[in-house]
Amino acid sequence: NMRNKLFILILFVVTLSVSAQNGSEAYTFLRFPTSTRANALGGHTVALVERDPSLIFHNPALLGAEMDGMINLNYMNYISDINVGSALFTKAHGEKGAWGVGATFISYGDIQEVLPDNVVTGASLSAKDISVNGFYSRDLSERWRGGLSLKFLYSGLADYTSIGLCVDAGLSYYNSDKGFSFGFALKN
C-alpha cells in the first residue's frame, strides 16, 4: 500500500544522507574558485550571466552559444606555494546549444615530510589535484538554460594517488530586460 511505499522511500533517503556523513571529504580542491574573477566575487558565481567562460566551472548552465570559439586561461598564485590554474575552450552547437572542454589544477608546492611521532625527515613531498571537464548546455526557452558537466579527477600526494568521476548539473534564468539572473547548481 501507499503508506509502506512512503515509509520505505523515507528510510532510503535517510540512509543515504547518514552514509554520507563519515567525517572525511575527498577532492576538496573542487571548492576552490577557478578564476581570479570568481575569487574576487566571493568564490562561487552560479548566477552571474556574462561572456566569461570560466564561470561555467561553477554552473555549467552559464555556458551558451554566445561563447562560440572562446579560449579562457587563468592562473592564481594563491597562498604560499599554492598555484591554481584553469584552461577552457567553448564552442557553439547549433543556435541553442554549446559544449566546452577544460581543466583545472592546483599545485600545493613542496610539503615538508613529518613522521607520525613528529620527526622531521628533511624530505619534501609534492601534492597536486587535477580536474579534466567536459561541458554541455542547451537553451530550454528564451530565459532558461540547463547544463551538465562531467569531471575526471586526479589527486596525488607523494606516492599516493586517487582518481574519481563526478557530474555537475545546473540551471540558469536570465531576464535581460530587467537585468535579473538566477541560477543554481548541483555539484560533485
Question: Whereabouts are the PLM-identified features?
Answer:
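Positively charged n-region of N-terminal signal peptides that target proteins for export
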Residues: 1-6, 142
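Extreme N-terminus of proteins, especially the signal/transit-peptide cleavage junction
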Residues: 1-2, 19-21
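Sec-dependent N-terminal signal peptides
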Residues: 5-16
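Subset of outer-membrane beta-barrel
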Residues: 21-187
